[in-house]
Swiss-Prot record:
It comes from Methylococcus capsulatus (strain ATCC 33009 / NCIMB 11132 / Bath). This is UDP-N-acetylglucosamine 1-carboxyvinyltransferase. GO terms for molecular function: UDP-N-acetylglucosamine 1-carboxyvinyltransferase activity. Pathway: Cell wall biogenesis; peptidoglycan biosynthesis. The keyword RNA-binding does not apply. CDD domains: UdpNAET. UDP-N-acetyl-alpha-D-glucosamine binds at residues 93, 308, 330. It comes from the Bacteria. The gene is murA. Its EC number is 2.5.1.7. Its main location: cytoplasm. The active site is at residue 117. The modification 2-(S-cysteinyl)pyruvic acid O-phosphothioketal is found at residue 117.
Amino acid sequence: MDKLLIGGGRPLSGELRISGAKNAALPVLAATLLSDGPVTVGNVPHLHDITTTMELLGRMGLNLMVDEKLNIEVDPSTIQNFFAPYELVRTMRASILVLGPLLARFGRAEVSLPGGCAIGTRPVNLHLEGLAAMGAEINVRNGYIYAEAKRLKGCRLVLDQVTVTGTENLMMAAALADGVTIIENAAREPEVVDLANFINAMGGKVSGAGTDVLQIEGVDSLSGAGLNYRILPDRIETGTYLVATAMTGGRVKLKGTRPDLLDAVLAKLEEAGAEITLGDDWIELDMKGRRPQAVSLHTAPYPAFPTDMQAQFTAMNAIAEGVGVITETVFENRFMHVQEMQRMGADIKLESNTAIVKGVSRLTGAPVMATDLRASASLVLAGLVAEGQTKVDRIYHIDRGYECIEEKLAQLGAEIRRVPN
């Protein structure tokens, strides 16, 4: 198992190209199951979760080819089984996304209950209740979901809570259902919009994506023939490098991104004292060597402040001027990075779902351990500003969501390297 060694104290500067969004690529790859022939997906990030998804599709018998530009061609016509085994699903919660398309296209699915980051209870009951309402027969036994349906029927679904993967699974299922499906209280995330765009590019009829009411008119078949669909840029990777730049007092230009998807994050960075310039597909942030000002925020579903940026802003507040109050409303148990930051000298007090962060003038390098994807990133950011060396262990979490993080940070001037344990 690898770890990262980081020497702090260098301002980040330079230019960086942003990768495709993992959280858009995973549902789009699952949605290739809906196509009646080969479909090509581009701008896919090179990440462990993507490899896992490709292995999962390959185990079902799908034919996958990757070209020199890392475009992935998926041919679902060679499918041999409808089984998603525990050993693959347990490492990645998003594996549940094959359930809806398998059921809609092939009438059956056997999918292990999911794993992924250990942040709170992220139940799949909303997925199952929605599919049952569309006419699926569902049994959960021995840790597996067994689902069957002749042809799903369109219906009106009102989700009890906002769920991104739930919205995506039900949207994919509804794409081939008989009749119209309305999903109310749907997730509005850009990645949900990207999936809707992909389904429509194959001949689907999804409208309302980006609002909280989706309407899906089921069609008889979908085809990805001649389609090369590009995944949208990763807004969380973008945000992470912007915060890293703000923390180190640097100046960085991020290219191949989507500023329009980051309003809440950019507003908080400006509040922290960053000078931000935007283009259609680039963002430049300049701290002019200043120490950031502490900011207060609370997380909520898109378009509000993203929970996936909470840990990074906790790290920024740890070395900022003033006191920042961070309230986490999306997931419970999402402050596991706090204990590790305290080992580096951060002054953070936890009260229920709130972290009160009093900025200190310096952090000191220490051995720390990653506990989940975004927590790991925040510890890397803390290491970039700490005095001395920081060792971040269990970085397989980072590899699930950040493409070559040490190479990209080194490109911006950070002292960081990956070493085997």
